[in-house]
């Protein structure tokens, strides 16, 4: 499949995979890409498959000259689903912001090699952390 920019989707997925354990290929569809990060374990006592994590997820959409994004902070629950939620622990929030910024910088630099920009989606009004310069 070719994206609106003319680049093959499979090539971009391979490049995104090289950024680290962020892309969830099975949740990508058409021109949309899904990334997430399980940054902080809520409680290490349960068995690994029962653990919950604080983290973030980002959706990117390919357009002709840019990728747009939205992201959310929240809880990755025992059922394996994301729930948007307010996180009160300042250290957890700082860790999430750090990992999100790091991913954003890597993704932005990668897309620049394809002469594409990475910008907030036009309808993304809940940007808690400014990522674009």
Curated annotation (Swiss-Prot):
First-listed, main subcellular location of the protein, grouped into a coarse class: cytoplasm
Keyword match Metal-binding: no
TM region(s), chain numbering: none
Pfam family, one: Crl
Gene Ontology CC terms: cytoplasm
Alphabetical GO biological process terms: positive regulation of DNA-templated transcription
Subcellular location, record wording: Cytoplasm
Residue ranges of the region described as Essential for activity: 99-122
Keywords associated with the record: Activator, Coiled coil, Cytoplasm, Transcription, Transcription regulation
Coiled-coil ranges per UniProt: 90-113
Entry's family note: Belongs to the Crl family.
Function noted in UniProt: Binds to the sigma-S subunit of RNA polymerase, activating expression of sigma-S-regulated genes. Stimulates RNA polymerase holoenzyme formation and may bind to several other sigma factors, such as sigma-70 and sigma-32.
Name this protein carries in UniProt: Sigma factor-binding protein Crl
Organismal lineage: Bacteria, Pseudomonadati, Pseudomonadota, Gammaproteobacteria, Enterobacterales
Gene name of this polypeptide: crl
């Amino acid at each position: 499949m070719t994206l609106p920019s003319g680049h093959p989707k499979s090539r971009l997925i391979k490049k995104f995979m090289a950024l680290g354990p962020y892309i969830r290929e099975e949740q990508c569809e058409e021109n949309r890409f899904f990334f997430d990060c399980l940054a902080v374990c809520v409680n290490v006592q349960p068995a690994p498959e029962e653990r919950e994590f604080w983290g973030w997820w980002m959706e990117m959409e390919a357009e002709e000259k840019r990728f747009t994004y939205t992201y959310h902070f929240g809880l990755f629950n025992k059922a394996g689903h994301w729930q948007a939620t307010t996180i009160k622990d300042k250290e957890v929030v700082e860790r999430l912001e750090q990992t999100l910024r790091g991913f954003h910088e890597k993704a932005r630099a990668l897309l620049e090699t394809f002469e594409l920009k990475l910008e907030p989606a036009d309808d993304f009004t809940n940007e808690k952390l400014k990522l674009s310069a």
